[in-house]
Swiss-Prot record:
It catalyses: succinate + ATP + CoA = succinyl-CoA + ADP + phosphate; GTP + succinate + CoA = succinyl-CoA + GDP + phosphate. This is Succinate--CoA ligase [ADP-forming] subunit beta. Succinyl-CoA synthetase functions in the citric acid cycle (TCA), coupling the hydrolysis of succinyl-CoA to the synthesis of either ATP or GTP and thus represents the only step of substrate-level phosphorylation in the TCA. The beta subunit provides nucleotide specificity of the enzyme and binds the substrate succinate, while the binding sites for coenzyme A and phosphate are found in the alpha subunit. The gene is sucC. Pfam families: ATP-grasp_2 (PF08442), Ligase_CoA (PF00549). Mg(2+) binds at N199, D213. GO terms for molecular function: ATP binding; magnesium ion binding; succinate-CoA ligase (ADP-forming) activity; succinate-CoA ligase (GDP-forming) activity. Its EC number is 6.2.1.5. The lineage of its organism: Bacteria, Pseudomonadati, Pseudomonadota, Alphaproteobacteria, Rickettsiales. It comes from Ehrlichia ruminantium (strain Welgevonden). GO terms for biological process: succinyl-CoA metabolic process; tricarboxylic acid cycle. Belongs to the succinate/malate CoA ligase beta subunit family.
Length: 386
C-alpha cells in the first residue's frame, strides 16, 4: 500500500525525524487559511499523487509571493500530471501540499528497503541526493552505500558509521545521519513498511537535517495490524480494476496493452506477458487467479479484464492443484453469464487438461483452444491484429 508524501512525513515526524512545516489543501477555499498557517516567505506547492518525478512534470512549484503560491495551487488542483512513473494518461491532482521553504546547504539520499535476498532490512545512503538514486548508482556506484541490518542484533552505531565512512563527513554529520538511519529502521519495524525513502534529506546552513521529500510503502499482508495506517489509503490514487480484483482475492496490475491475460501463478503470468510481447503485441494486464480459482473467481476475472476495453483475451492455465476441467466449466459459465465480444484463446495444461479442452470445444461458444503457450499467444496476437 502506498501513501502520500505528506502522510509519510507525519509518520516520520512521529518517530523523531525533522520535516518542514506543511498544510494539505483539497480545494481553493482552503488556500488562504493554509498559507497563513505556514507563515513562510517561501512556499513550496507540491502535487500529491502516488508517483515520483513530480518536479520534472511541473508538480513542485517554489513560490516567493502569495500571488505566486495562489496561482500555482489554482493551476495544480484538478490538473493531470504525467511523469515517468505514471501511465500515459497521467494522474489527476486532487490535493496539494503547501510547505515552508528550507535553507538548503547540501542534499543527501537515505532509504530503507526489505532486502529479500538477504532476509534483512537494508539502509541505503548517498551524498548525491535530489536525483534518481538509480542514476547515481549507474554513473557513480561508489557514491551509494548499502548496509544490511541483522534482525537479531538490530541497528547498531557502527552501521551508521559504515554508511558515512567514505563520504568525508564530519563527526557531527555522521552522528546526525546515524541517528536518522536508526529512526528509519525503527519506523520500518514498527509500521511494517516495505520501503522508506527520503530524497532529498537536506542539511541546512545551521547543520540541521530535514526530510524534504518522503515516500513510504507498506506490506499489504501486514497492513491489518495497523488500522491507523490503513486509514491513510487513498482509493482515488488506485486503479479501479486493481481495487475490484483485491476484493475477490485476485492479483491484478493494469498495463498499457490491448490483450487481456488470465493466468494462474505469478511466474506463468510473467511468461505469458513475455510471449505476447515476443509475437508483437502488448499485454493489457497482469492477472493471477491463484491456485484455487472457482467459477465465481473466473467470472469476476473476466469482468475485470473486459472493463479495460481489451481487443482480445488469452487464458493460460496450468492445472496442478486446480483441475483444468473445473476451470473450463468456470470459463463456459462466465461467458454464458456476462458474454464476451472479443476473441478468446484458451490454453490448458496439467491435471485433466484433455477433459477441459473437450468441454471448451464442445461448448459451441466462440472459444479458440491451443495445445501450448506458443500457439495460444501466436493465435491471439494475430487475430487481434487482423
Amino acid at each position: 500500500m502506498n501513501i502520500h508524501e505528506y502522510q509519510a512525513k507525519q509518520i516520520l515526524k512521529r518517530f523523531g525525524i525533522s520535516v518542514p512545516e506543511g498544510v494539505i489543501v483539497h480545494s481553493l477555499n482552503e488556500v488562504n487559511d493554509a498559507i497563513n498557517k505556514i507563515n513562510s516567505k517561501v512556499i513550496v506547492v507540491k502535487a500529491q499523487i502516488h508517483a515520483g518525478g513530480r518536479g520534472k512534470a511541473g508538480g513542485v512549484i517554489v513560490s516567493r509571493t502569495l500571488d505566486e503560491a495562489k496561482t500555482a495551487i489554482k493551476n495544480m488542483l484538478g490538473s493531470t500530471l504525467v511523469t515517468h512513473q505514471t501511465s500515459k494518461d497521467g494522474q489527476k491532482v486532487r490535493k496539494v501540499y503547501l510547505e515552508e521553504g528550507c535553507d538548503i546547504k547540501k542534499e543527501y539520499y537515505i532509504s530503507a528497503i526489505v532486502n529479500r535476498k538477504h532476509g534483512q532490512i537494508s539502509i541505503i545512503f548517498s551524498t548525491e541526493g535530489g536525483v534518481d538514486i538509480e542514476e547515481v548508482a549507474a554513473n557513480s556506484p561508489e557514491k551509494v552505500v548499502t548496509c544490511n541490518i541483522d534482525p537479531i542484533f538490530g541497528f547498531q552505531g557502527f552501521h551508521g558509521r559504515n554508511l558515512c565512512f567514505d563520504s568525508n563527513l564530519s563527526v557531527d554529520q555522521t552522528r546526525k545521519i546515524t541517528s536518522i538511519a536508526e529512526k528509519i529502521y525503527k519506523t520500518m519495524l514498527e509500521t511494517d513498511a516495505s520501503q522508506i525513502e527520503i530524497n532529498p534529506l537536506i542539511e541546512t546552513s545551521s547543520g540541521d537535517f530535514i526530510a524534504l521529500d518522503a515516500k513510504m510503502n507498506f506490506d499489504d499482508n501486514a497492513i491489518y495490524r495497523h488500522p491507523e495506517i490503513l486509514e491513510l489509503r487513498d482509493y482515488d490514487e488506485e486503479i479501479p480494476e486493481e481495487i475490484e480484483a483485491s476484493k475477490h482475492g485476485l492479483s491484478y496490475i493494469k498495463m498499457d496493452g490491448n490483450i487481456g491475460c488470465m493466468v494462474n501463478g505469478a511466474g506463468l503470468a510473467m511468461a505469458t506477458m513475455d510471449i505476447i510481447k515476443y509475437y508483437g503485441a502488448e499485454p493489457a494486464n497482469f492477472l493471477d487467479v491463484g491456485g484455487g480459482a472457482s467459477q465465481q473467481t473466473v467470472t469476476e476475472a473476466f469482468k475485470i479484464i473486459l472493463s479495460d476495453n481489451v481487443d482480445g483475451i488469452l487464458v493460460n492455465i496450468f492445472g496442478g492443484i486446480m483441475r483444468c476441467d473445473i476451470i473450463a466449466n468456470g470459463i463456459i459459465a462466465a461467458i454464458q453469464e456476462i458474454g464476451i465480444n472479443v476473441p478468446l484463446v484458451v490454453r490448458l495444461s496439467g491435471t485433466n487438461f484433455e477433459l477441459g479442452k473437450k468441454l471448451l470445444d464442445n461448448s459451441k461458444l466462440n472459444i479458440i483452444t491451443a495445445h501450448d503457450l506458443s500457439e495460444a499467444a501466436y493465435n491471439i496476437v494475430n487475430i487481434v491484429k487482423k
